[in-house]
Amino acid sequence: MTDTIPHIAKIKNQWLAEQVDVQYPTKESLAGRKLYLAKAEQQHFTTLDTDIQCESNFAQEDIFLVDFHRLTVMFSLLQSQRWDKPEEQELIVEFLTQIIYSEPCQLYLGFSNGEPVAAAVVTTTDDAFLISDVVVNQASDIENCTRFALSIANKLSLNSSSSCELYLEVTP
């Protein structure tokens, strides 16, 4: 595990920060961006070995690409649980619900019994993949996050034996 931020993580953070670079951003979305970027600086990174055999909590059919606003709201609500204070959670929701679907990032949700219980961002470049911002059941413990990340990697056919690096962002 490393504190060094891989270039792909910088690309993801820049992409997210630019989501509120609009003509009339709300003060709440700008405050949410500031909170998000502060937390992003504290993250650690590890390479993700897709050859690891572990029990997955998510079948491929339970993982969905976020591609319309209602799913974005669900994604944002789950992500906001990474912050402790309710007022910070509200700012994060305001920030993340501004996301416009575009490369190089895609948002994913994991469902259980019809309820959203996991979320992550997948960033893709020519030479790397990053699975980040992983939250499972309002928690970010490494074991559950790794399982969800591996489930996403499996769904997207990302594997560590390819010529691309596969990174996982980990909350310390």
What residues fall within each predicted segment?
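A short acidic/small-residue loop/turn micro-motif
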Residues: 122-126
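Acyl-donor-binding surface of acyltransferase catalytic domains
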Residues: 1-60, 165-172
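Conserved beta-hairpin
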Residues: 104-119
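Short amphipathic alpha-helix that is part of the acyltransferase structural core
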Residues: 44, 48-95
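Acyl-donor binding region in acyl/amide transferases
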Residues: 2-6, 10, 81-88, 93-97, ...
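Short, functional N-terminal and low-complexity linear motifs
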Residues: 60-63, 117-121
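Short, Lys/Arg-enriched charge-dense amphipathic segments
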Residues: 49-56, 111, 128-137
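Short loop/turn motifs at secondary-structure junctions and domain boundaries
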Residues: 98-103
